[in-house]
Amino acid sequence: MTTQAGHEEQPLRLRNFHITFFAIVLGMAGFTLAIQKGGELFPVLELTSDWLLYFTLGLFGLVSLVYLAKAVSHPDTIRKEWNHPIKINFFPLIAKIFLVLSVVYLERNMQISYYAWVTGVVLQLLASVFIISSWINQSHFKIEHMTPGWFIPIVGAIIVPIAGVKHGFLEISWFFFAVGIIFWIALFTIVMYRMIFHASIPDRLLP
């Protein structure tokens, strides 16, 4: 009985492995970058940033493999997340991870930084096009669904120029930065309207 219950519990856990878990990886990537920059002032942090980078890469691989397993075994849950008015905004986290890692590797390996940046830019562009199209075309989105999480797809566009300029892609960097700023202003206006004239945002959805 215990064995059978365990086998039934494992698929349930996999179904509940949401796209939001990539936020942990993004947080670690950002923390690694902060420690790496701190190493310029405090050399003792240089070794710490190396270990943090290895840990972040391992965590990224682990989360990606688990989520890929979920996509293969439970594709219906992926579709539900994509159609969810809040969770859909967390898919660009993957692009942001690549973009932040491209900044981390600027001082370590320019070639790895370049490939990470290109991957992040492609994923960011695809995510932005599909998600913004979803915002415009979906009829089930309501003002109550507007949360700070809606900024996630846009913030990625603003990150692009950090490594993009170093790699010589000035025009592409300006394009993403301009798109990010324009949509950030639009979303900020909508969020302020939602906070003033509608019910307050739940605490669990606040940054």
Task: Briefly describe each language-model feature range.
Residues 28-37, 63-67:
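Alpha-helical transmembrane segments of multi-pass membrane proteins
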Residues 25, 42, 55, 59-62, ...:
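Generic alpha-helical scaffold signal
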Residues 35-49, 103-115, 162-174:
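Helix-coil boundary and interhelical linker segments in multi-pass alpha-helical membrane proteins
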Residues 100, 104-107, 127-141, 159-172, ...:
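Internal transmembrane alpha-helix with an interfacial aromatic "cap," most often the third helix
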Residues 1-14, 62-78, 121-138, 183-195:
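Hydrophobic, membrane-facing alpha-helical anchors
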Residues 50-65, 111-125, 171-186:
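Structural signature of hydrophobic alpha-helical transmembrane segments
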Residues 5-33, 49, 53, 75-100, ...:
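Juxtamembrane helix-loop boundaries in multi-pass membrane proteins
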